[in-house]
């Protein structure tokens, strides 16, 4: 049986949390005396007004959550946050279209970074801050944040954690899941604060520094500038952002060991992080070499532009410092391959994730060996441990579903009216939560020109991709809702 009362209670509590974040924007708008202040006040009141009856409906709820309940909470949390998160855009009139307002908000909470805005700098400070905050909240997950306070309801939170934690592994830092979530957010906040200070040291204004630090740590990519990081024209800022995108693509369990335990050997001996670094280095070297050959850039600039782009795309952050569509075609075509890779499991990034790619590569390698040595026993090992057959099956299923979703979305986008290249780019950018793509969704364009039908399909794909495919797809299965 689905524990609807507990779900209502959690949803109500989540809306109170969102109202708290919205109230920060009220203070900011009041400080700058800008016209978005009434929109934030109204949005906050509406959010609280809906949260109260939901909390009331959850009174005397049975204090337990099944795994099925966890999947419902996670998916509904993202949808609910996006529905109420779009209110400031819509009420203020800066994004007067419901489709566009919901698209911008879902792109924020899923940390996709795709935007329908053609003039970002026209937004007042409150909306710009809210836009960045949607990514910061979504980066580590609305639900992981809630796990830290779920003991208020007497719920341990493991079911929510299992549904939200990205990738096939997410090592628990401590035996208690609520303590784990608190440590994760401590590291998350620490990275954001440190980057803010370093960006300010590079003469980026305080407001811009905070916004970019939030969206970097979340690997989201929303910027306060239409031309993203390129607007600041600063090699120092580019290197700072590159470094923090790289760190944010690492498993947060490993960041805990690195920063709080000083376990350098264990961190840099991790199989996945070695794969992560190797793929980043490989693509950086290839694109740097390509730029040296095909462009007038020098070595330092070629390396800086290449490393920034590769790390931005592989961590699915989506910041840009150059219009790579102006580069040689083989170079910008590489971007579509990079977006598939993703960063580490247990990070804020989207995409397939390095651990899955690693396991798939080793499964394929073993198949070749098995042909030559039919009787050999060839386990797939990660960090010296054999990967369970169930994990291998899950990874293979993920790849299969991911590819099927790409082709289904690709075909549907072309039926909507997009051309071959644009349809593919929109689908992969949405599903992998990357943001910038190629063609009409390249770094020099917004997504505003897309038909509404394409935007809604992108919204669905952003949500599916952010919640690791199966979480959302399970809810679409009739068997999920059958009573047992």
Which ranges hold each PLM region?
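Membrane-proximal intracellular helices of multi-pass ion channels
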Residues: 1-484
């Amino acid at each position: 049986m689905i524990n609807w009362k507990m779900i209502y209670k959690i949803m109500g509590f989540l809306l109170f949390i969102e109202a708290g974040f919205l109230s920060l924007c009220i203070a900011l708008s009041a400080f700058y005396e800008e016209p978005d202040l009434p929109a934030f006040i109204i949005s906050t009141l509406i959010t609280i007004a809906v949260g109260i009856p939901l909390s009331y409906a959850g009174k005397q709820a049975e204090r337990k959550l099944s795994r099925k309940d966890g999947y419902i909470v996670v998916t509904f949390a993202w949808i609910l946050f996006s529905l109420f998160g779009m209110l400031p855009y819509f009420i203020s009139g800066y994004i007067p279209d419901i489709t566009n307002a919901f698209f911008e908000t879902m792109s924020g909470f899923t940390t996709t970074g795709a935007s329908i805005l053609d003039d970002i700098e026209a937004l007042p400070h409150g909306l710009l801050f809210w836009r960045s905050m949607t990514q910061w909240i979504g980066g580590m997950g609305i639900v992981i944040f809630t796990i830290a306070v779920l003991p208020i309801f007497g719920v341990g939170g493991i079911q929510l954690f299992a549904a939200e934690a990205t990738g096939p592994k997410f090592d628990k830092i401590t035996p208690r899941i609520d303590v784990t979530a608190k440590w994760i957010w401590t590291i998350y906040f620490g990275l954001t604060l440190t980057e803010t200070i370093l960006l300010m040291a590079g003469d980026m204004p305080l407001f811009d520094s905070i916004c970019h630090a939030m969206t970097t740590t979340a690997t989201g990519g929303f910027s306060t500038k239409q031309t993203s990081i390129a607007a600041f024209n600063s090699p120092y800022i580019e290197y700072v952002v590159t470094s923090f995108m790289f760190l944010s693509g690492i498993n947060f369990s490993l960041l805990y060991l690195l920063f709080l335990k000083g376990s350098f050997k264990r961190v840099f001996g991790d199989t996945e992080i070695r794969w992560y670094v190797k793929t980043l280095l490989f693509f950086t070297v290839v694109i740097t070499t390509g730029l040296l050959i095909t462009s007038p850039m020098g070595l330092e600039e070629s390396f800086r532009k290449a490393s920034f782009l590769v790390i931005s795309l592989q961590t699915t952050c989506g910041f840009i410092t150059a219009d790579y569509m102006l580069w040689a075609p083989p170079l910008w075509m590489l971007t579509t391959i990079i977006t598939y890779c993703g960063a580490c499991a247990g990070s804020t990034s989207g995409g397939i994730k390095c651990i899955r790619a690693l396991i798939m590569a080793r499964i394929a390698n073993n198949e070749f060996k098995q042909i030559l040595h039919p009787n050999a026993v060839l386990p797939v090992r990660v960090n010296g441990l054999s990967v369970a057959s169930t994990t291998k099956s899950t990874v293979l299923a993920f790849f299969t579903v991911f590819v099927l979703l790409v082709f289904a979305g690709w075909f549907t986008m072309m039926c909507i009216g997009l051309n071959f290249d644009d349809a593919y780019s929109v689908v992969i950018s949405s599903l992998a939560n990357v943001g910038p793509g190629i063609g009409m969704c390249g770094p020099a364009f917004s997504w505003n020109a897309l038909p509404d039908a394409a935007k809604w399909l992108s919204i669905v794909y952003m949500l599916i991709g952010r919640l690791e495919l199966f979480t959302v797809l399970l809810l679409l299965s009739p068997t999920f809702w059958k009573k047992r």
